[in-house]
């Protein structure tokens, strides 16, 4: 019997715990630098530090709050460059926004789309107005125009993408069931998969996060993971919840402009328990899908 790869917790914020067999790296000292976003020099410093700390073999990586989704880029950089694969992201946001100060949790998909080993990037479950007309100019258009990136959205008016010539990189649906059926119907099961799940793609009926949330149910994630069985070469999960007060006024302003509020600690603890129960279920499913 092949042993499951041990889950790995990159513990910046204390949000993730109680995952059986997980390896935990304490990284709280990096929280102020890395959370929400950072300069490229800081990102590279963390990347170098983790090279000495991360185990040689690990399974699904948990990064804590969705404020750390840009760490997916760091994890992608660790994969062998000679192997082509598809990047499948579940997220209520495109994470393909312009950010001139380095990399942040809402811009990393653009940088991932530039990696030559990635055949295509799919972002499933977008319900955010980040891809609506009012924010069209904030999106990186180049990966959409090159057809390297596809948005799979639910109930967002994205007609502007047709106007700029990127209509074929957008799939619009009125219900998450329709979206998942359509995606799985065209899914290339012969190509390895890196799977990145931000739990803000889920309805608040499932779990709560500190970001605006989408309409997916847990079953939609289960269906996707099952379809990837035998092809997953890497996976990460973010979208857990934690309370943090930035020392940086700039980060406090950025966070507030994205609609984030500082949560009471009692509320955080209740939500974390629900999140950790879901995390354990996701790990069990992902462990069935590794490419051997």
List where the protein language model places each region.
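Conserved alpha-helical scaffold segments that buttress catalytic/binding sites
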Residues: 2-292
